[in-house]
Design a protein with these regions (language model features):
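Bacterial N-terminal signal peptides that target proteins for export
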Residues: 2-12, 134
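Bacterial N-terminal signal peptides
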Residues: 12-21
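Boundary at the C-terminal end of the N-terminal hydrophobic targeting segment
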Residues: 26-28
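Thiol-/selenol-based redox modules, centered on thioredoxin-like
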Residues: 31-39, 159-209, 320, 326-351
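A short beta-strand-turn-helix
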Residues: 56-77, 212-236, 264-267
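Hydrophobic beta-strand anchors of alpha/beta hydrolase catalytic cores
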Residues: 78-79, 109, 155, 236-237, ...
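Conserved redox-active cysteine motifs that mediate thiol-disulfide chemistry
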Residues: 81-98, 239-262
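Short, internal strand/loop/helix patches
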Residues: 124-160, 278, 289-327
């Protein structure tokens, strides 16, 4: 073999091997991403499996009501959380519709849009595009808290006895085995309905006055905010997700842009003493470790609180990212605005 040909052959082999290595690495990362979602979903539900599920009444987007207490004992329930901007959700939708068509007489299938950066205007066209025909709900956070939403998509299976049976993220053989198991479980004559839903928490509204607030940051620092005192400050709460800017860049660019805009603006505004800002992160696709990485990557100096149990999002009635809540020195909530509100840009400009 001539030296020149040998040289080109070696170069070709090197390039091919590099491409194979790159593909394998990318494929491994994709598998790890799915495995991470599966781990999060199972971890969130592990303490609930075997326990009674909530006897909730769910209203679909067409106005129908599904009373779970009337379903338990007769059929199992399959709840699937999803979002229009979620890439693996989109990938799983054909299979989701196939499950509904095949098993809808045997299992109560409920499609639950998380409501996070979604509304009726985004959900309806998505359902049509994906060809989804099962009952669909747009959550206000109630189902997410009751069923421990941590990832999108997330599967929740409830057996015929009305007990949590399975939590998952991936559409794999194990999930389908679990689905078949609850479907073919013997029907029970009697189910003890346990109201496992917590009483409705008070949700703060614009105009309400708070006496004080206390947080613990991801650095384990305590923040105590007392209102109505001489040294009280105006307070700004920013509800966000560490993935909002990069993950939504292509699938929900307006939301991604809003998250960047809010972060950059408040980073600048925090240098003044007019408002004391606190960032509060969602627990969906988030953890303390990821928030530390977010803080490092974006160089933000604002204190960050991880809402691990979702209670802060609940009591302030937040389900959109980003959402800004402003309180005066007396603790009165002066305004609450999210990316989906028409006055969002005006509020940002006025800060």
């Amino acid at each position: 073999m001539k030296p020149m040909y040998k040289k080109y052959l070696n170069l070709f082999v090197t390039v091919v091997l590099s491409l194979v290595s790159f593909y394998q690495q990318a494929h491994a990362e994709e598998i790890d991403y799915a495995a991470d979602g599966q781990r999060r979903a199972q971890s969130a539900g592990e303490l609930l499996v075997g326990k009674p599920a909530p006897d909730m009444k769910i209203t679909t987007i067409d106005g129908s009501t599904i009373d779970l207490s009337e379903v338990y004992g007769k059929k199992p329930v399959y709840v699937k959380f999803w979002a229009t901007w979620c890439i693996p959700c989109r990938e799983q939708m054909p299979g989701f519709e196939a499950i509904y068509k095949q098993y809808h007489d045997q299992i109560e299938v409920i499609s639950v849009n998380t409501g996070i950066n979604d509304n009726l205007q985004s959900v309806k066209p998505f359902l049509k595009k994906m060809g989804l025909t099962m009952p669909t709900v747009i959550d206000d956070g109630t189902l997410a808290r009751a069923l421990k939403l941590r990832v999108t998509p997330q599967h929740v299976l409830i057996d015929k006895q009305g007990r949590f049976s399975y939590f998952g993220h991936v559409d794999d053989e194990n999930f389908h085995n679990q689905l078949e198991r609850v479907i073919h479980q013997p029907t029970v004559d009697k189910v003890t309905i346990v109201n496992s839903s917590a009483p409705d928490a008070h949700t703060y509204q614009v105009g309400d006055t708070l006496k004080n607030l206390a947080f613990t940051t991801i650095n384990d620092n305590s923040i105590e905010l007392k209102f109505g005192e001489d040294n009280s400050a105006n307070i700004g709460l920013v509800f966000f997700g560490p993935w909002c800017e990069w993950y939504l860049e292509e699938t929900a660019p307006d939301s991604s842009k809003a998250c960047t805009q809010v972060r950059e603006l408040l980073e600048d505004k925090s240098k003044s003493n007019n408002i004391k800002w606190v960032s509060i992160s969602t627990n969906v696709w988030s953890s303390v470790a990821e928030l530390h990485e977010y803080k490092k990557s974006y160089g933000t100096s604002l204190p960050i609180v991880f809402d691990g149990d979702g209670k802060l999002f609940e009591v302030f009635g937040v389900n959109q990212i980003p959402t800004i809540i402003l309180m005066d020195k007396s603790g009165r909530i002066e305004s609450k605005v999210s990316v989906q509100d028409s006055e969002f840009e005006n509020v940002l400009t006025s800060l």
